[in-house]
């Protein structure tokens, strides 16, 4: 590996450790030319599927867009940032584990709705009203009734 200080091509690995999370390897290195030390990290590079929009265009998956959608639905709701991050992580894991190269935007919307249903029922209704393009009060009432049915224990 090239030294970031002097650009020399030869460096020596002094120490190698697995991160606490187990998802990366930390290497402490020393340049054989300038003797300076630096740290590198090795991580698995996974490629998220390409998102196919309603109009047929394709775009790269953007976790920031996902985060923005969740935060907008959860605005002024008592849900922690950690819970939002965990929901984003679960959605990303589902997309990665599908093994698909492409995912239809509607599938992501459905995953977001499931996560919001778990996190906050009000945020779920907010998101569903936009995502499903509610056009009248009856559609809101149906969604609210559906959420209400899920809360009642089975007899």
Swiss-Prot record:
Gene Ontology terms: biological process: negative regulation of DNA-templated transcription
Cofactor mode of binding and number, as noted: Binds 1 zinc ion.
Keyword Transferase set for record: no
Domain ATP-cone: from-to ranges: 49-139
UniProt entry tagged with the keyword Repeat: no
Cofactor(s) needed: Zn(2+)
Keywords: ATP-binding, DNA-binding, Metal-binding, Nucleotide-binding, Repressor, Transcription, Transcription regulation, Zinc, Zinc-finger
Zn-finger (unnamed) residues: 3-34
Gene Ontology MF term list: ATP binding; DNA binding; zinc ion binding
Domain of life: Bacteria
Assigned protein family: Belongs to the NrdR family.
Summary of the function given for this chain in its UniProt record: Negatively regulates transcription of bacterial ribonucleotide reductase nrd genes and operons by binding to NrdR-boxes.
NCBIfam families (UniProt xref): transcriptional regulator NrdR
Protein name per Swiss-Prot or TrEMBL: Transcriptional repressor NrdR
Gene from which this protein is expressed: nrdR
């Amino acid at each position: 590996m090239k030294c970031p200080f002097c650009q020399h091509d030869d460096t020596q690995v002094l120490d190698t450790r697995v991160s606490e999370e187990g998802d990366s390897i930390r290497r402490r290195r020393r340049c054989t030319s300038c003797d300076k030390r630096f740290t590198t990290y090795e991580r698995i590079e996974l490629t998220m599927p390409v998102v196919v929009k309603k109009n047929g265009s394709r775009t790269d998956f953007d976790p920031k867009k996902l985060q923005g959608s969740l935060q907008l639905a959860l605005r002024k709701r008592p849900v922690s940032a950690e819970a939002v991050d965990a929901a984003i992580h679960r959605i990303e894991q589902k997309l990665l584990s599908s093994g698909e190269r492409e995912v239809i935007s509607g599938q992501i919307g459905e995953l977001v709705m499931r996560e919001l249903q778990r996190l906050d029922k009000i945020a779920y209704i907010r998101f569903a009203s936009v995502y499903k393009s509610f056009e009248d009060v009856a559609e809101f009432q149906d969604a609210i009734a559906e959420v209400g049915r899920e809360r009642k224990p089975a007899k």
